[in-house]
């Protein structure tokens, strides 16, 4: 009868004929009864199901139809199985009850329970089991029951309280329940339950998870079955739910096909994290490459009963796809199940069994042959083979540049066609993964493909799904490779590469307990981290196979058992997305290698719960996170990662050998690579140099981020510059960084800095922090490809503050070198600048000067400086290793590896790219419409302000903060001259000086026209703030002086005669200013002592001022000023329309000069010149 009533869901039937009749009768009784409860309980709900089902109903149920409660059920179970249940809803009352009765007798507890009366916080129900019915449907793992429930209502109850005889049993159940009223007929209850007959054990027992569908209205059996099928669709995550019998049959068919009788997991190919040994010894010319999507691995299994997906744990999903023809039945193919917005995909990357052939160990079927078989399956079975032409289909020559250009175009066309086909699909879209197989013409070829795939798919957004990494598959091996974990470094395996930020270890976790058995809570007393903030200590376990059984053991690094200190929110330990993480589950962690000065327990950061592995632990007591040996291997990739930049360098034939040499020389040593993020260590070393760098940044920010500015800070890191923007009076600030940990997770994150600043500073501007990568476009779609798994609040910030928003100033301090790695990254960065910067807005940049480093490294491999510590050991302060070749064209992709002892652990190198001033100025003008306003070397600023900083701060009336910074910089200057407390300080100062003087700053403005006579605003602002006599700066545009670039000469006399001839009729009052540079050699860097000399030329009745400036490169320039003391100020009088130049500025120039002369105290002794 049941089968005849089904009219949907592929005629799926839940009830047998007998069950059907019994349930009809139960529904009739429910409709006629007053106090009957009718509910369906779903068995075998594990933690992954619990989380997925909860999330599903939260997303589809209106907020006013959702209830959540935490309460304690105390049930008195009588010999006749009837139940008297008291529910306590007040958490304080629950705590008091547990404390009071933890050691009491059962009789005392029973008498207390019966003494309670119903109230707002107490609910009492009597369950009459004798009046109910129960049907178990094992084939669908559900129980259908009806029970009489009589609530006790104060003063209205029809039943009396039970008498305590001592024969009662007590059961305690602490519940966290979510209730969803999904329609007018039914309610879904999802409950996390801790059950125990012993009260004091209640909070220590593991959770069970319950799912119930309860009727709230009268319905017929067809409606009930339809409701149940809808729930099964959610539980099984499929449109076609299947019974336990069908699932068991599919698993049995799979085991028989592959002759793997005892397994509870897929017999799939192992994929291991790639390391330098694999790159050096195995991958070149022997591997193909494809992308790894952010999806789940499944086998697709074709049978005569349908097509199914088998998960790692042999969970079965049935697909809504017609049965294939007989030749393609008993077929197994390996792939990724990928969910995207609006479409689901299954991407096949290998074949296991097809048309009677087992491909697992057959060496005659290499990868290229299996690819042909996969293509045929996709075409014949699913009709989704999208054409992709091999290079040799259209070309005869094998040249890397031609191949690269061809595949870039072919991939773009392929994915365009792919998306068109996908958008037309209404069901699961099944197609192939695309492999690029090298021709073997150069060892760099495979890495060229890997670099191309990653950048085009991620930063150019070619794919409709997010990437999780790159897969390297051996060309000449069968599907399965024989060899255990011990052989992973001795034979070719399949390798997985992930960006270093996503290298993670899966741990089985247990929280430390207190004396009561509950999770222990500790409080952080560190002011630097989070004073007084509560946290839990999480013990981190991995799996170890011992005598054929897997057991969890605590993960160790250098013999130290690893733990994670996880801060709590509302009493719950949470992952980075704010989701609670629970005891006895498997959680994915990343390790923040940038927290250099913190204990390891603060560096482990939980990313997400791994529900698949948690399920495996709960079902089979297997997969306690990663296996120990696998975890150790991943740890090596965390501490010595293969970065995107290394892959890119390996993909360039001109730098391949050099990169291989670096990987070989430093393999398993302290030469580590770190990408895209670095932060200053908490150290007193080179405090003067750091203060000097910050002083320059402060003045840039204060000058160009004026009151009311809206600022976008690209590469804001952990917010070290926030106070600078606050002091500048900005109105609104948005900081962007690729490192989400530095923005939000760690204790000294940008967000935490902002919160702390708000406590001490009034009227602080709104500041927001967005996890984003400027190498991709600032759109949500683009950023989700680069940073998969970002939380919803970050998506909201991108849409709100990046998409369609423009800023007065964009700040980019010491990060632009990351965006010059390749053309695609640079183009995206420039598009972002163009899209986000207002007209007439400013772009502020600091970076190494590429010309300086390029010149110093000509014919050399490295540039470094060192110092001797207090133990007499010589330490490298910084080292730059040249990755590029001297023959490379200056511009993009000029790679160096930088070790900086201030930001990195010993041996940790950061890949950067040289920033060449000429390239930067030309490219930003062409791509963004930016004009250079001003730029100079830190070296020149350093020399210019030497006299100022060598004076004590007391002479300037500074604030305490300013005086501290001034003092640090002053000591830096003095140390360089040998005037310090000890030789170590002198040594460190000189070593740090060599690093700092490699830097340059730039200010660009977004405007189509710019006046070359515009002054150096940074210098003017500096001078105003320090109230110091104005120095003549080594700039072309400085202190509102106009420099006549047309009359530059190396002969001062010719310049002077030119001025005299030009202004013969004005009888000028002339001063000749000579900028003398006395050079002191310090290793290969020169210290310059500036000296200003003045010569009085001639007096006049209506004096004019003419100046000659000698630049550091020994060029002489005429400078023009005119004093309008005898006439009112009029802009028209100082502007030369015919030359479109300002001849002079107002009284301020003369005032500046007078101050300068007075400060020198030389005016009285200046000789007259005829």
Curated annotation (Swiss-Prot):
Reactions mediated catalytically = a 5'-end triphospho-ribonucleoside in mRNA + H2O = a 5'-end diphospho-ribonucleoside in mRNA + phosphate + H(+); a 5'-end diphospho-ribonucleoside in mRNA + GTP + H(+) = a 5'-end (5'-triphosphoguanosine)-ribonucleoside in mRNA + diphosphate; a 5'-end (5'-triphosphoguanosine)-ribonucleoside in mRNA + S-adenosyl-L-methionine = a 5'-end (N(7)-methyl 5'-triphosphoguanosine)-ribonucleoside in mRNA + S-adenosyl-L-homocysteine
Per the UniProt record, which EC number(s) apply here? Answer: 3.6.1.74, 2.7.7.50, 2.1.1.56
**Which residue numbers delimit the mRNA cap 0 methyltransferase domain?**
684-1007
Keyword Heme appears in the UniProt entry: no
Annotated GO molecular function terms are: GTP binding; mRNA 5'-cap (guanine-N7-)-methyltransferase activity; mRNA 5'-triphosphate monophosphatase activity; mRNA guanylyltransferase activity; polynucleotide 5'-phosphatase activity; RNA binding
Keyword RNA-binding assigned to the entry: answer is yes
Which keywords has UniProt assigned to this entry?
Answer: GTP-binding, Hydrolase, Methyltransferase, mRNA capping, mRNA processing, Multifunctional enzyme, Nucleotide-binding, Nucleotidyltransferase, RNA-binding, S-adenosyl-L-methionine, Transferase, Virion
Query: Where along the sequence does the record put site: mRNA cap binding?
Result: 724, 753, 817, 912
Which positions are annotated as binding S-adenosyl-L-methionine?
697, 715, 737, 813-815
Coiled-coil regions listed: none
> Its annotated pathway?
mRNA processing; mRNA capping
Q: Name one Pfam family in it.
A: mRNA_G-N7_MeTrfase
User: Which subcellular locations apply to this protein?
Assistant: Virion
Role according to the record: Responsible for methylating the 5'-cap structure of mRNAs.
Full protein name: Probable mRNA-capping enzyme
Please give the organism. Answer: Acanthamoeba polyphaga mimivirus (APMV)
Q: What is the lineage of its organism?
A: Viruses, Varidnaviria, Bamfordvirae, Nucleocytoviricota, Megaviricetes
